[in-house]
């Protein structure tokens, strides 16, 4: 099985909604989601090279669960790699999303490691200011910054929505070029 020095993941976190209005905007109304236990059960650690960096997109309500996920996958939390401050689609104003307490307009990508990976560029910045696109799509700039930070190493994107050059991909919206070693679920199926 191919091993990767960079794993980039944007799991389809399931959320509890508190109103009918929120149900129409939730992730579940856009794509299949997964509960935390199913995300934790994915054998992501088996894809990791001896020295590997994990970049994991999370939303603030899932922060504690995300830390459980990276531990279950065999990684140790290091820092927040990126803070995506979202701008509206049509102008440069800040996007105002939903939120359980305050109106959310940022998401974070945490960085975790297995072994002792080394960064190659100390000038990569944390804040990404960019426009939102389709629901939950992350800015392409994040991938570019990951390669600048860690180098042109074997890399895979999990839960991918596109197939960027230089990346192996796994997800239910792409033709998979990477495979998770699972007996019960075929590649790219989230129906665990």
Name these PLM-found stretches:
Residues 1-192:
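Class I S-adenosyl-L-methionine-dependent methyltransferase catalytic core
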């Amino acid at each position: 099985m191919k091993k990767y020095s960079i794993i980039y993941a944007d799991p389809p976190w399931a959320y509890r909604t508190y109103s009918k209005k929120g149900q129409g905007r939730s992730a579940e109304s856009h794509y299949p989601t997964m509960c935390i236990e199913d995300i934790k059960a994915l054998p992501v650690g088996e894809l990791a090279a001896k020295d590997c960096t994990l970049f994991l997109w999370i939303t603030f309500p899932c922060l504690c669960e995300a830390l459980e996920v990276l531990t279950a996958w065999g990684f140790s939390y290091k820092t927040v790699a990126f803070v995506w401050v979202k701008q509206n689609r049509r102008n440069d104003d800040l996007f105002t999303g939903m939120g359980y307490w305050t109106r959310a307009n940022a998401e974070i990508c945490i960085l975790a490691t297995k072994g002792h990976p080394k960064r190659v560029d100390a000038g990569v910045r944390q804040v990404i200011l960019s426009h939102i696109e389709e629901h939950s799509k992350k800015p392409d700039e994040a991938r570019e910054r990951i390669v600048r930070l860690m180098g042109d190493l074997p890399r895979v994107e999990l839960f991918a929505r596109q197939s960027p050059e230089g990346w192996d991909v796994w997800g239910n919206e792409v033709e998979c070029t990477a495979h998770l070693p699972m007996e019960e679920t075929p590649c790219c199926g989230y129906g665990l």
